[in-house]
């Protein structure tokens, strides 16, 4: 695949316009299949965490930064999954545990093939995130029963104190998306 790297852009007007950071790329491993960064603030380490797909190899990498400009490697996450497929669109969410006062972390990623309904889908695994690495405490599970749930990312748009997370994902599959009617949109 072609070379992929991570870049930074910033806005000074609440998202109306964007400026590319002069020091781009902020993270470049020198190869392809390095995509779909999910960046979030981790209060426990007071660092930004970047979860990135090593898509073609089928695993994930974690990096940390104090300033979003300089990134240091933290750890890797690998897991045997059905279909042994391309991994994309990772996400890592801290969620409350129903009926308990603690939290757990959900690590989610999408695979190109292997879903029991046919085609691609989202896998999730519950565990603990320690600020540097993720340890699974349960086996991976499919997060949706259909083959049309892909590339979902959680957005941090809920009001403070609201524990819900909102996922926005594709209603499509790589296996037939190019064959669906698109006129006049494409």
Label for each model-derived stretch:
Residues 146-157:
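Catalytic and ligand-binding motifs that coordinate phosphates/metal ions
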Residues 1-37, 41-89, 94-145, 159-164, ...:
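Beta-rich carbohydrate-recognition and catalytic domains
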């Amino acid at each position: 695949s072609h070379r992929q790297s991570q870049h930074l852009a910033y806005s000074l007007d609440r998202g109306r316009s964007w400026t590319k950071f002069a020091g781009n790329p902020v993270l470049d491993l020198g190869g392809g299949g390095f995509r779909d960064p999910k960046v979030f603030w981790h209060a426990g380490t007071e660092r930004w965490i970047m979860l990135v797909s090593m898509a073609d190899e089928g695993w994930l990498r974690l990096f940390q930064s104090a300033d979003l400009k300089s990134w240091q490697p933290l750890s890797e996450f690998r897991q045997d999954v059905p279909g042994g497929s391309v991994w994309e669109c990772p996400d890592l969410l801290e969620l409350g545990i129903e009926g308990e006062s603690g939290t757990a972390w959900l690590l989610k990623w999408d695979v190109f093939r292997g879903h029991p309904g046919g085609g691609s889908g989202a896998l999730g695994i519950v565990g603990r995130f320690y600020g540097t690495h993720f340890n699974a405490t349960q086996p991976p599970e499919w997060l949706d029963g259909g083959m049309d749930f892909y590339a979902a990312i959680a957005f941090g748009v809920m009001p403070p104190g609201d524990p819900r997370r909102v996922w926005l994902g594709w209603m499509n599959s790589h296996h037939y998306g190019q064959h669906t009617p698109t006129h006049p949109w494409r």
